Design a protein with these regions (language model features):
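Functional-site microenvironments in short loops/helix caps that host divalent-cation chemistry
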Residues: 100, 104-107, 114-239, 247
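A short glycine-rich, aromatic-capped structural motif
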Residues: 34-95, 115-117, 190
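Short, structured beta-strand segments at or near domain termini in extracellular proteins/domains
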Residues: 250-266
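Acidic glycine-/aspartate-rich tracts in secreted/extracellular proteins
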Residues: 72, 198-200, 263-264
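Sec/Tat signal peptide C-region and signal peptidase I cleavage site
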Residues: 30-32
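Bacterial N-terminal signal peptides
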Residues: 16-27
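Short, P/G- and charge-enriched loop/turn segments at secondary-structure junctions
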Residues: 52-56, 241-247
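N-terminal secretory signal peptides that target proteins for export/translocation
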Residues: 1-14
C-alpha cells in the first residue's frame, strides 16, 4: 500500500469518527426520550385552592394525562443542551434567559435541574415529546401523599412539606430520595418549585407583565394569589415564587417536569 493511500485512509478515518459518534449520540437520545418514565394520571375532579374572580373555589374536571415520575435532572438537561446547543448559556438569546441561567450547573446525574428559564423548560419538554403541565394538572397531582389522592387537609402532611422546603435551603436537591405519592410521582412538594405552562395566571394584576411578551398567556390576569384555603401555606409560597418571576428568569429553587396529553382523553 502506498503512503499516499495510507494517508487518505487515515484522513477518512479522522473524518468518519466524529460522524459515527454523532450518529450513536442521536440514536441514544431517541431511546433515552422513550425510556424516561411517565406515569398515567387518571381523570378526576379537582377542587382547586385558587379562587375564581367571584371569590369561590374553582372546580375543575381533569382529563387523564401522563406525568414524568421525577423532575428533570442536571444530567438529563445536559443531554438536551448537547442536542440543542442554542440553549447553552453562551448561545441562548438574552430574551430567553438572564445572567443566572444555568448557574451552579455541573451535570450531576441525580441532582435536580434548577436555574432554568420558563422558555428553556418548555423547549426541553418539547424535546422530550411532551409539554409543561398546566397549574391545575400540577395541583391535581400535588394534592396526593403516599396513601391518599387528596391529602390537603392533613395538617401534619402540610407542616412536613414546609419543613422539607426549609431544609432544602441548606443543601442540594437530589431526585427520588423519598417515597412517591399514591400516583407513583416523586418530589412533587418537598424538593423544588416547578414551572407550569400557564404560570402567568399567578399574576395578581392583568397588566403586571408586558402584554407583548410570552408571559401573557391565556390565563393571564386570573388572581391566583386569592387562595380558598389559607392553611395551604406551602402552596401559597409556590404561587408567590412563580408570580415573582418573568419567563426569562430562573431560580435555584425552581425546576420543572413534563407531562404528555393522552389522545382522546376527557
Amino acid at each position: 500500500m502506498s503512503k499516499g493511500y495510507e494517508l487518505q485512509v487515515s484522513e477518512l478515518n479522522l473524518v468518519s469518527i466524529p460522524i459515527f459518534c454523532m450518529m450513536l449520540f442521536m440514536i441514544s437520545q431517541i431511546s433515552w426520550a422513550d425510556e424516561v418514565e411517565y406515569v398515567r394520571i387518571p381523570s378526576g375532579h379537582l377542587q382547586s385552592n385558587l379562587n375564581d374572580p367571584s371569590g369561590q373555589s374553582m372546580g375543575v374536571l381533569m382529563a387523564a394525562f401522563e406525568m414524568r415520575s421525577r423532575p428533570v435532572t442536571q444530567q438529563e438537561f445536559d443531554s438536551f443542551l448537547w442536542a440543542q446547543p442554542q440553549w447553552n448559556k453562551k448561545q441562548i438569546s438574552p430574551l430567553m434567559a438572564t445572567s443566572d441561567y444555568l448557574a451552579d450547573h455541573d451535570g450531576a446525574a441525580e441532582e435536580v435541574m434548577t436555574h432554568v428559564s420558563w422558555f428553556a423548560a418548555r423547549a426541553y419538554c418539547h424535546y422530550e415529546h411532551a409539554r409543561l403541565p398546566t397549574w391545575f394538572e400540577w395541583e391535581y397531582v400535588a394534592a396526593a401523599d403516599t396513601w391518599q389522592k387528596d391529602a390537603r387537609t392533613d395538617a401534619g402532611r402540610n407542616q412536613g412539606i414546609l419543613t422539607a422546603l426549609q431544609e432544602r435551603l441548606h443543601r442540594k436537591g437530589y431526585v427520588g430520595q423519598h417515597l412517591p405519592n399514591s400516583y407513583g410521582i416523586y418530589d412533587m412538594n418537598s424538593l423544588i418549585w416547578e414551572w407550569v405552562e400557564d404560570f402567568a395566571a399567578m399574576f395578581p394584576q392583568p397588566d403586571a407583565r408586558d402584554s407583548s411578551s410570552a408571559a401573557s398567556l391565556a390565563l393571564c390576569g386570573g388572581s391566583a394569589l386569592a387562595f380558598h384555603d389559607r392553611g395551604q401555606f406551602a402552596l401559597m409560597m409556590r404561587v408567590a415564587a412563580l408570580s415573582s418571576l418573568r419567563p426569562d428568569q430562573s431560580s435555584s429553587f425552581v425546576g420543572f417536569r413534563c407531562v404528555r396529553s393522552l389522545e382522546g382523553s376527557r
